[in-house]
Amino acid sequence: MSNVTHQPKIGFVSLGCPKNLVDSERILTELRTEGYDVVPRYDDADMVIVNTCGFIDSAVQESLEAIGEALNENGKVIVTGCLGAKEDQIREVHPKVLEITGPHSYEQVLQHVHHYVPKPKHNPFLSLVPEQGVKLTPRHYAYLKISEGCNHRCTFCIIPSMRGDLVSRPIGDVLSEAKRLVDAGVKEILVISQDTSAYGVDVKHRTGFHNGEPVKTSMASLCEQLSKLGVWTRLHYVYPYPHVDDVIPLMAEGKILPYLDIPLQHASPRILKLMKRPGSVDRQLARIKQWRDICPELTLRSTFIVGFPGETEEDFQMLLDFLKEARLDRVGCFKYSPVEGAGANELPDQVPEEVKEERWNRFMQLQQQISAERLQEKVGREILVIVDEVDEEGAIGRSMADAPEIDGAVYLNGETNVKPGDIVRVKVENADEYDLWGSRV
């Protein structure tokens, strides 16, 4: 009679941003390596881990609801992630949670799991883990986290209080991980962090090593090295430092994708000062023009906040004027929402909700028109598209201008002779304010 040992099962809920997703992947990789099974149902699991988000109040609410659901359905719950930094807030609502840890507390999470659900006898056949680790994204793209934390103290944000100051990963480790991802079939690497352009600042851009070669710990050096892997490299969360200018030529040369996700947040110098953000709109417009002169194919994505405390109609009009002038390709807009612990909560002249709503609508109406015009310029042109999914009706993919989850899509109706991860040439036939339609060339 065979000696079959029980393989302990862990349920896992991952909430929030791609940076949190990477943390979840790391925890899951460790659990699978140790022989735990990861299951999709609460009632099958010996325990549930909830990786939370605590960035804005709606995210806090979603996290608390997910914890409650896991407690109701399973009963044994460990909480980690950003909201875990506010243990009292979680305990007040859910006193029966077993353990709570903050973000990137991987070792603590594993220790707690070992305590409540002891490690299984290691069976290498049950716990085979791919070299690139457990990934929660489709096989053809992956997030590459290059640092943790942030040195900025924007008044609307509490990330530094949750994730701490900037800590850059050694550049050799980052490049080795990127190589493993590419060897595993990844076709697109999405570089993420709290502040990608600050990479290496905390270590004074010291020289690291990869494959025995010296490499400077900086965003530009990282991009130069990633370009050698022969896959799409996309930059996210790029704070508008002057040295961002250094990566634009790499985009123009086709070494990394001509795509910049650069959160500008506002255009009124007064509001930017209240936010503790850099505040020269004229300089930013001049830089955008310069970037486009160097790299005409550049796609610019940004995010903005309307209804920030103290925002007047004049401030808001400056923001609309900036949009008209900058003609950004992809834009997200948030109505200011107070976050517990954020400095902006103490500012006078809070904007009424109905005014926030009205300004958000005006903002989106203008930007949708600009985005539609920018996409219309692509009709008739040929572009490269990476395929994300295929069904009997055709394929859906993304151009170099589209990041997963947050940007638009390219629809290839009737094109079934492709598979996810394929990069194909497409002639654009139609466009709206978000998406493109086309046929394979």
Swiss-Prot record:
For this record, an example GO cellular component is: cytosol
Q: Boundaries of each MTTase N-terminal domain copy?
A: 8-118
Give the enzyme's EC designation: 2.8.4.4
Cofactor section: [4Fe-4S] cluster
Residue span, Radical SAM core domain: 136-373
A Gene Ontology molecular function term of the record: metal ion binding
Q: Which Gene Ontology biological process is one annotated for this entry?
A: tRNA modification
This protein's record includes keyword Transferase: yes
The listed locations are: Cytoplasm
Q: Which cysteines are joined by disulfide bonds?
A: none
Which residues does the annotation say bind [4Fe-4S] cluster 1? C17, C53, C82
| Cited function | Catalyzes the methylthiolation of an aspartic acid residue of ribosomal protein uS12.
Regarding protein family, the annotation reads: Belongs to the methylthiotransferase family. RimO subfamily.
> What name does this protein carry?
Ribosomal protein uS12 methylthiotransferase RimO
Which organism is this entry from?
Salmonella arizonae (strain ATCC BAA-731 / CDC346-86 / RSK2980)
